[in-house]
Amino acid sequence: MRYNEKELLCLSRQRAEKAAELGMRGPKKGSVLKKRLVKLVVNFLFYFRIDEEEPIGALLLEHCRVSKEDEKGFSIHFIDEPEKKYMFECSSQEQCVEWVEALTNASYEFMRRSLMFYRNEILKMTGKDPLEQYGISGESRFQLENASL
């Protein structure tokens, strides 16, 4: 997927849902753990050299798996490239659990499935589709038969 560099830079400067200095190791063999400022903004994970304003990279958190590796560590790997694994080291077990949860919940697909789940619950309780008032209930991305939590 292609992204406009200026748009990504602008997005990286927005308020982060989560940010911290974490140890990070890239997917290349022999890569060493380096301290990085890591910021979660919407469904992008930006990483920066400490004390620099421009990100050195970004991961789009779609079609990926976030896994807890050990007490303080987690990884991200992409379904279409399982051999490419990004490793992260947190300062505590609690911080690690928080990051895994935040990253898992950041994907568009997770948000869409959550929307479908709550839409279905409201429909059961009220008999009304809450998306009808916005004129979008018929769009394919909002169809209930495609959603399962």
Swiss-Prot record:
Lineage top rank: taxon: Eukaryota
Q: Where is the PH domain?
A: 15-108
The record, for InterPro entries, names: Boi1/Boi2-like, PH-like_dom_sf, PH_domain
Q: Which is a Pfam family this sequence falls into?
A: PH
A single Gene Ontology CC annotation of this entry is: cytosol
A biological-process GO annotation: receptor recycling
Q: Which SUPFAM superfamilies match?
A: PH domain-like (SSF50729)
Mind telling me which PANTHER family this protein's record contains?
PLECKSTRIN HOMOLOGY DOMAIN-CONTAINING FAMILY J MEMBER 1, SESQUIPEDALIAN
Q: What is this protein called?
A: Pleckstrin homology domain-containing family J member 1
- Its source organism is Xenopus laevis
